Amino acid sequence: MKAKFAKVVAVIAAIGLAFGASAAPARAAGSTINLYISADTNIQDLWQKTLIPEFNKVNPNYNIVVTFDRNGANDAQTLAKIIASRDTRRNPGIDLIDGGMVTTLGAAGLLYRFNTVAIPNLKDVPKVLIENGKGGIPYRASQVLLAYNSTNVKTPPKTLTALLAWIKANPGKFTYNAPAGGGSGYSFVQTVLDSQLTAAEIKTLATTEDKTIQAKWSKGWEILRGLNKFTYGQNGTYPVNNAATLDLLSKGLVDVAPVWSDQIASAVKAGTMPKNIKTISISGPSFTGGPAYLGILANGTNRPGARVLINWLLSPAGQNLIVAGSMNGLPVIPVSKLDPVAAAGIADLDITTMRPPYVSANANNVRSGWATEVPGK
């Protein structure tokens, strides 16, 4: 195991340690790439157990140093430090970011502006995904789905309205995790909030912080508070994260819950989720999903190395690992370019139609707002 991960240096530490104290000279290509991951542990595992070892097999001269921030708990602090490093012309201690803040960084002009000359494999990525990234580079995708126990739920709800009615008709059999703890619960909360907004307002919140529109979340908070006595526990308490939601499903303690497509597929493959747990998409509106973005910091010290890593990730070899490995993710290049075995079951995939989550600033306010407006109310 040590040999397998010889090139991986995992730094799970206070966020402040992720930033250098002074400016440093640019590193030569083929040295250290500082990767900051703001996500759940399955993304951490994807990088450290699959992507980095495989990348190092063909690029042995790179040492990838990982800093992990679970579920973006320190996104606001990290963003502030990046801005400060730019303003003071100091080394941010980060070259590449995988996390929800990437589009915010891009909109603020803090990301390296890439092109297909620097990253040739971008030519295979749909232009709409690149444009939506605001300077971020899409490298994988996933979708929040509604998981249900097919033994107990013969006709699962297919719309948000039907789901809300089902929850009230089946007390204690539905749950979702706290939005700050994971994206599946966050997606459910955003979807309820969006159900009370116009299409134009939803589109705005996906790209721009808007306090006026946020004020209209009040109707959504009211709906969510009204579910407290009907969700698992029936006292306004919720699972702490994505994994806790999956655990309740696997043990049969709940029959219905929102889950990440990649996480539920991984659990079924690993045998930790019963095969009678199925998934379905809902509409009116749908749960959120779409690509995850990588951002190359404009003032990072190893932009060339970050470009090499991203170009490899966008190759068929890199995308096959995302689709067929433990991640069970969705590709951002045409399925026709993937290994046929890896692509089995996703031939009709169109990730360009997935509904995106809010931009980071709005998403953070969803998380904090839910914590004060919903639990125990």
PLM ranges: what are they?
Residues 141-144, 224-227, 274-295:
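Periplasmic-binding protein-like
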Residues 76-92, 104-108, 243-253:
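Short helices/loops that flank or line small-molecule/ion binding pockets
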Residues 339-377:
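Extracellular/periplasmic bilobal clamshell ligand-binding domains
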Residues 287-288, 292-354:
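Mature extracytoplasmic/periplasmic domains
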Residues 29-100:
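Early extracytoplasmic/lumenal segment of secretory-pathway proteins
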Residues 17-26:
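C-terminal segment of classical bacterial N-terminal signal peptides
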Residues 38, 42-48, 69, 73, ...:
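Extracytoplasmic ligand-binding site segments that recognize negatively charged/polar headgroups
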Residues 103-106, 256-275:
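A ligand-binding cleft/hinge motif common to bilobed small-molecule-binding domains
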